[in-house]
Each structure stands twice: as structure tokens, then as C-alpha cells.
A protein has these predicted regions:
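…; additionally, a secondary subgroup of soluble metalloenzymes is captured
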Residues: 1-193
Length: 193
């Protein structure tokens, strides 16, 4: 064993934005036969009871800083969803997107592909905690458009402050179009490495 083998090398499973969630990148490669950033938003939409649509989906997460200065998701209550929809939908429509709501989870969808990728929200605490800004946790040629959209959402939520909980910002992640998932097999899981 081991004779004639190549020296070990570093294998990168995902782009740097997803370094804190390589398990998602690996699972994405196994289940879809595609590389790149793992796309999770359309599957979250479908898992929450939404129909399969031929559009890109993005999960929109409202956030605030906790007492320790870390980012945490703001859980909206069902009674707050109409106010959230009234505040956010006009901005989404102006950007060529549609605000979709499933339960208390916000999604954006659009027909035109978006050259933008962002770290998953649950990884932001590490990303921002390391001294980086939120802007360092996103990439792509459409990044300025996404940043402007997030700023507009934040301003709208703060304007509707009496009807919504304290929201310091929004985050888009998991974006992309639905891709059929292939049944996993041990062979494909190993071959994916």
C-alpha cells in the first residue's frame, strides 16, 4: 500500500465564500453533478410546500446584531408578514424580482440569471467575526446590484419599524435555479471526491 501513489494534495471543495460549509458543496456535487456554489434556496422553497418554478430563487434573511455583536436571523411572526410584504415587494418588483413568502420565510425569485454569490447566512458570524465586512462575504459581477437591493430592503424595513421587529439588514443566499437531484449512491459519493 502506498507505493507509487501521488503525494497528497490540497483539494478545494468550494469557492472561498463557502469554505465554512464544505459539506454543502460536497452534497451539491454528489446530488446534482454540478460544481460551484451550492444552490439551496429553490430546494428550501420546494421543501416548504412551494411549487417548482423555472426561475432563480434566493433566500432573503432579515438580521440584527445580538448583545455580543454577532449576527443573528430575525424570526418574523406570521402577523408581521403582511407588513414585511408591503415594505419589501415594491422594491423587489422595481429590481425585476418577485417577493415570495412561505410561512415566515422570505424568498426572492427572478427569471434572469444573476452573476452573484454569497456565503450562507449561518456562516456570516464567522465571516464577519474575523474582521471582514459583509461585502467580503459576497462575490460576482452583479454584487453592486445586490448590495443596493439589500440597502433598499433595510431602509424599507426601518421605515416600517412600528410594524416589524428591529431589523438591521438583510442577506441574500443560496441563490440559483432548481436542478433535478439524482439519487445518491456510494460510488457517486466517492467519485465526487
Amino acid at each position: 500500500l502506498g507505493t507509487g501513489r501521488e503525494p497528497p494534495g490540497l483539494q478545494r471543495l468550494a469557492e472561498p465564500l463557502h469554505d465554512r460549509s464544505p459539506h454543502q458543496a460536497w452534497l451539491w456535487k454528489v446530488l446534482t453533478h454540478r460544481s460551484g456554489a451550492p444552490i439551496t434556496a429553490p430546494y428550501e422553497w420546494i421543501a416548504s410546500g412551494g411549487p417548482v418554478l423555472d426561475q432563480e430563487f434566493w433566500k432573503l434573511t432579515p438580521w440584527q446584531r445580538n448583545s455580543m455583536g454577532q449576527l443573528e436571523a430575525v424570526e418574523l411572526h406570521e402577523s408581521e408578514m403582511p407588513a414585511a410584504a408591503c415594505a419589501l415587494d415594491p422594491i423587489a418588483a422595481h429590481a425585476g424580482m418577485r417577493l415570495m413568502i412561505s410561512g415566515t420565510t422570505l424568498f426572492l425569485c427572478r427569471r434572469k440569471p444573476w452573476a452573484f454569490s454569497a456565503a450562507p447566512f449561518r456562516d456570516l458570524a464567522d465571516c464577519v467575526g474575523a474582521g471582514a465586512s459583509l461585502a467580503a462575504c459576497m462575490t460576482g459581477s452583479d454584487k453592486p446590484e445586490a448590495e443596493n437591493l439589500l440597502e433598499a430592503f433595510t431602509a424599507a424595513a426601518q421605515t416600517a419599524a412600528g410594524k416589524l421587529p428591529s431589523i438591521e439588514g438583510f442577506w441574500l443566499s443560496g441563490g440559483g435555479a432548481y436542478t433535478p437531484i439524482f439519487p445518491p449512491s456510494t460510488y457517486r459519493a466517492v467519485a465526487c471526491d
